[in-house]
Structure formats: C-alpha cells, structure tokens
C-alpha cells in the first residue's frame, strides 16, 4: 500500500515537473505548487536539497518526504524563521539518509550550523517550539529530541545514517 501510494505520488509529481515553470520562485502563500530544486524561498532564505523538488500544499502537519519534500507553508508561516528552515532541512535529511528521525535532525542541525544561521539561541528557540508542538509517534519526546539536537550541534564532522536509530 505504501509503495503504491509513493509510486502514485511520484508519477503525479513527474507530470507536474514536466509542466512546471522552473524559473518561478515560490512565495510563502503559493499552495499546491511543485517547486523545482533550488527555487524554494522560505522566510527570505533560498533552501535546497540537491535535486529534490518541493511540493507546497495544505495537509495535516508541517512536512513529509518521499521522492519530494512536501511542506505545509500555511502551518509553518507563524513559526520562527529558524524553525521553518530547520523543518525543511530535517525533511531533506530524510531524503538523504532515510527514515531515521535522529539522523534527519542531525543532518538539519549540522547543515544549519555550517550555513551560519544556527547558534545556541536559535537552537533554544527551536527546542521551545518542539516542546509546544509535541512530538507525535515518530519523533523522540521533546526533551530527548532537544538533547539530541544539542549533541549534533556540538559534534564535528559529517552526518551518517548511523548517528541515530529512530
């Protein structure tokens, strides 16, 4: 069932990619658009995940990933900018490293740190939002997740899928 759903999404997105205008940037209010790789701008920052496209649409939650990153910009719009960016990079982490929540979080934190916009204060803000939003069935509880984010922030070097098992 999951495979069939992913294949359906993949084929629909391929069709949309063929008809999409690759020169168009997405604004935070453009729901239902497939954004070509390298063209997504969220809260003033251009975000990329290699050759992965982003589908901006309304759905339950903030973001999911499969063959594309799906973002609910409407649900994210009131979050602090660093939280919005980290959500995107978390989903990019799933594209790159698979289903591990910890590996996706670690990838997001390290990429944000390398880009220079994630510091201790921004990390505290992100943890505060996670504590309010809860964690759902897939993510570690907020306190454990923030501890893992801090460990990834402090750790030097690259991310591997073995960094986390969740």
PLM regions: where:
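Long, well-structured alpha-helical subdomains associated
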Residues: 117-166
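Active-site scaffold of zinc-dependent metalloenzymes
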Residues: 52-81, 92-95
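Bacterial N-terminal signal peptides that target proteins for export
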Residues: 1-8
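Soluble non-cytosolic domains of exported or imported proteins
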Residues: 78-83, 98-102, 140
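Auxiliary, metal-adjacent structural segments of Zn-dependent hydrolase domains
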Residues: 21-65
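An active-site-proximal "capping" alpha-helix that borders the catalytic cofactor pocket
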Residues: 99-115
């Amino acid at each position: 069932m999951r495979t069939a759903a992913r294949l359906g999404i993949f084929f629909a997105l391929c069709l949309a990619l063929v008809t999409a205008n690759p020169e168009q940037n997405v604004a935070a209010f453009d729901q239902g658009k497939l954004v070509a790789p390298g063209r997504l701008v969220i809260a003033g920052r251009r975000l990329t995940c290699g050759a992965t496209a982003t589908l901006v649409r309304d759905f339950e939650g903030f973001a999911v990933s499969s063959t594309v990153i799906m973002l609910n910009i409407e649900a994210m719009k009131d979050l602090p900018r660093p939280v919005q960016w980290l959500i995107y990079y978390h989903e990019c982490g799933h594209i790159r490293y698979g289903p591990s929540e910890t590996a996706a979080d670690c990838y997001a934190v390290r990429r944000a740190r390398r880009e220079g916009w994630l510091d201790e204060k921004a990390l505290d803000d992100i943890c505060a939002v996670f504590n309010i939003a809860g964690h759902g069935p897939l993510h570690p509880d907020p306190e454990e997740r923030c501890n893992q984010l801090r460990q990834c922030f402090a750790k030097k070097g690259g991310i591997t899928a073995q960094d986390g098992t969740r």
